[in-house]
């Protein structure tokens, strides 16, 4: 029961942060983040990967690899570090769930035969999604900090 309240509170805070930022959120990025929410404790320093994290992560790897590309970008990595997320642990997460992810594929996807307008649109979407990931990381860190104070 207590765990359910924590997750409910977590989602309420995320929605408030997203609404207050005025940013555009597309369905794909929200879906991706919702699927990876069970991994947040691990990304905030818990050394054991929760079992409930691996299946959603495997689904994202197979069905939405662009999500992982956004999360391993230099911009997201530096912002995640500032928010207290161990980026090395985040990068090791797929392997700890028994999955292999090739980060070179992210470069191949981004350099595919797209036009300049496609690229500029992609850059705008990537910025928006990176901003959302940073907001998520900060919200998770604040919640974790508040939980430690209350406990």
Curated annotation (Swiss-Prot):
Belongs to the plant LTP family. It is a lipid-anchor; GPI-anchor. Residues 1-22 form the signal peptide. GO terms for molecular function: lipid binding. This is Non-specific lipid transfer protein GPI-anchored 30. CDD domains: AAI_LTSS. Residues 121-151 form a propeptide. A lipid is attached at residue 120 (GPI-anchor amidated serine). Glycans are attached at residue 44. The keyword Aminoacyl-tRNA synthetase does not apply. It is found in: Cell membrane. Lipid transfer protein that promotes the number of phloem (pro)cambial and pericycle cells. One of its GO terms (cellular component) is side of membrane. The lineage of its organism: Eukaryota, Viridiplantae, Streptophyta, Embryophyta, Tracheophyta. Expressed in vascular tissues of all organs. Expressed in seedlings, preferentially in hypocotyls and roots. Also observed in siliques. Disulfide bonds join 32-69, 39-53, 54-97, 67-106. Keywords: Cell membrane, Disulfide bond, Glycoprotein, GPI-anchor, Lipid-binding, Lipoprotein, Membrane, Signal, Transport.
């Amino acid at each position: 029961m207590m765990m359910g309240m924590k997750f409910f509170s977590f989602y309420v805070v995320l929605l408030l942060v997203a609404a207050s930022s005025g940013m555009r959120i597309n369905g794909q990025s929200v879906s991706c983040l919702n699927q990876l929410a069970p991994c947040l404790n691990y990304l905030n320093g818990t050394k054991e990967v929760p079992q409930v994290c691996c299946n959603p992560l495997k689904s994202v790897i197979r069905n939405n690899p662009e999500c992982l590309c956004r999360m391993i970008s230099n911009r997201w990595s530096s912002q995640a570090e500032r928010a207290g997320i161990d980026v090395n642990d985040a990068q090791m997460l797929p392997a700890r769930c028994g999955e292999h992810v090739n980060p070179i594929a992210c470069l191949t996807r981004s350099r595919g035969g797209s036009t300049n307008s496609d690229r500029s649109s992609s850059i705008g979407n990537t910025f928006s999604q990176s901003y959302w990931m940073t907001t998520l990381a900060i919200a998770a860190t604040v919640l974790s900090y508040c939980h430690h104070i209350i406990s």
